[in-house]
Every structure is written in structure tokens, then in C-alpha cells.
Regions:
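Pol beta-like nucleotidyltransferase catalytic core
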Residues: 2-91, 95-169, 173-284
Length: 284
């Protein structure tokens, strides 16, 4: 098979060269070596020798109307070079990008019923289930203080449940702990964690749930109610009053399913191998 030259068009918020030294899966093979195995020549920046291009969309705060966007849209529409579009933003934060996007050439974390699913890639880690009982019997929450999140945190605290909150921006609650400099290290100290997605629409699904599960937290997840994650079935809890109150009773089954998920091939939907395969296979 001939080499495929891919030009990754730089973005102001998301670029892939930092991934190349990371393990592509549990094998220890790096992303760079895996791309070589697949006969891929990856170029960062536009390149006249490239066979195809990869674009990454940016949100409303990052130059919707910019020279870079105009150039990218010109290339997509006028030039004949194949491309794929990656959108890591909620649809409500990237309206123009979604309006302009070709559904056949777009992978998205908020695909709705129009686009193809994109999973953010992350490294595998041991969830440490065997030492779970040694963790703090408290709930951890890492996220920005948005109004609906503050209301939920107050409701949890009003139930007499211990919850610690981490973020750069202060929360108007006494249990705000400051910034979590290492998300994984903080999470591994807690038995439970709340994950509240940035959007509850269009089947939005980020890396947040996997980040929690791979650290062995029993996770209460708030997302689009229509979102289905069959690979993760039984490995997390929906956020509701009953699940919070029964968390100790439910935790052993959740932990068992986390172990199955992380030690089987199911977790690989979040692997760098799967991420780059989806891009490459779009062109082959």
C-alpha cells in the first residue's frame, strides 16, 4: 500500500503533535510508530505534497470569522483535495462551523442525527479498583461553576452528602477546594465523582466520563438524556436522587463493570489508535 500524506491544519486550540509520543493503546507502541505502521506520513501545517487534509473546528470564542477560517473554507470548497473535519465543540458553541460542515466529512463530539461520532482520545490507566475502599468516602466534582451545576451541588450538600469541588474559577460554596492541578491524582483520592457535560444536547459526549472511569471513580453522569454509550453500559450511574442515596449499595456492581470495561477491548473507543484509525480510514 502506498504512503498516505496527511496535512493537519493547525488550530488555535487543538493540535496533535503532542500525542505522537503517547501510547496508542495498551501495547506501549507510540502514536508516531503506529502511524508509520499504517504507512502514514503526518505533516503539521498545510503542505503541497499532502494527499489529504485534516481540519479542526474552533468555538465561538476562537475566531469564527478569521483569516484562518476563510482560508480553510476556501480550500474545502474550491480545491479538490480530500479532507475531514473534526469538531470538538458543542453545536451551540460552534453554530457557524456546524452550519457549514459537510456531514459526510465531519466527525463531532455532538453529532446529533447528522454527523459521525468523534471520541476524544485518552491514555489507558489502571483504575485501581482493588484499593477503592481506602479512598475518601466523598464525592469529587471537577468543573466550572455554571448556574445549573451550582444548583445541583447545593442540592447534594443539602442531602447531607460530603462533596468537594475543584475548578480555577471559585464556586460560591464553602466546599470549593481550588484548582485541581492534576485531575487524575485528585480523582483517585475519592470514591465518587460527578461529571456534568458542557452540553446536554445533540448527543454531546466529551472525554470527561472516561477520565473519571479510568481513575476508578463511581461516576454520576449528567448528559443528553438521549445519549447511549453501549461500551460503557453499567460502568457509571445516571445522576438522580435515588442513585446518590444508594451509592454505597450500587458501587460494587459499578466497580465490577469498570474493571471489565478497562481490561477488555471496550475502552479502546477512547484510545489514540481508534482516534487515528477513524481519521485514516475516512480516506481509505
Amino acid at each position: 500500500m502506498n504512503s498516505l500524506i496527511i496535512a493537519e491544519i493547525p488550530s488555535g486550540i487543538w493540535n496533535f503533535p503532542p500525542y505522537f509520543g503517547l501510547p496508542v493503546d495498551r501495547s506501549g507502541l507510540t502514536v508516531a510508530d503506529y502511524l508509520k505502521q499504517r504507512n502514514i506520513i503526518w505533516k503539521f501545517g498545510d503542505d503541497p505534497t499532502a494527499d489529504v487534509r485534516v481540519y479542526k473546528e474552533e468555538n465561538i470564542r476562537n475566531g469564527l470569522i478569521s483569516f484562518r477560517r476563510l482560508k480553510n473554507e476556501y480550500q474545502k470548497r474550491i480545491e479538490k483535495k480530500p479532507y475531514i473535519n473534526l469538531n470538538g465543540e458543542a453545536q451551540e458553541n460552534s453554530r457557524i462551523a456546524y452550519f457549514l460542515a459537510d456531514p459526510e466529512r465531519t466527525l463531532s463530539v455532538a453529532p446529533g442525527n447528522r454527523y459521525k461520532r468523534l471520541f476524544f482520545p485518552r491514555e489507558w490507566s489502571d483504575p485501581g479498583i482493588e484499593t477503592w475502599n481506602q479512598r475518601m468516602d466523598r464525592i469529587c466534582w471537577i468543573g466550572r461553576p455554571l448556574p445549573e451545576r451550582i444548583r445541583l451541588a447545593k442540592n447534594i450538600a443539602a442531602m447531607g452528602i460530603d462533596i468537594d469541588i475543584y475548578s480555577k474559577e471559585p464556586w460560591p460554596l464553602k466546599n470549593w477546594m481550588g484548582y485541581a492541578t492534576d485531575e487524575a491524582d485528585v480523582s483517585q483520592k475519592y470514591k465518587y465523582r460527578v461529571v456534568f457535560e458542557n452540553s446536554l444536547k445533540n448527543l454531546y459526549h466529551s472525554e470527561k466520563l472516561f477520565n473519571s472511569i479510568r481513575t476508578g471513580c463511581v461516576t454520576f453522569y449528567i448528559s443528553d438524556p438521549n445519549l447511549e454509550l453501549p461500551n460503557l453500559k453499567g460502568a457509571y450511574l445516571s445522576m438522580n436522587h435515588d442513585n446518590i442515596l444508594k451509592r454505597e449499595e450500587l458501587s460494587q456492581e459499578i466497580l465490577k463493570n469498570i474493571g471489565k470495561f478497562m481490561l477488555s477491548g471496550d475502552w479502546e473507543i477512547y484510545s489514540f489508535k481508534s482516534f487515528f484509525d477513524r481519521i485514516i480510514d475516512s480516506f481509505r
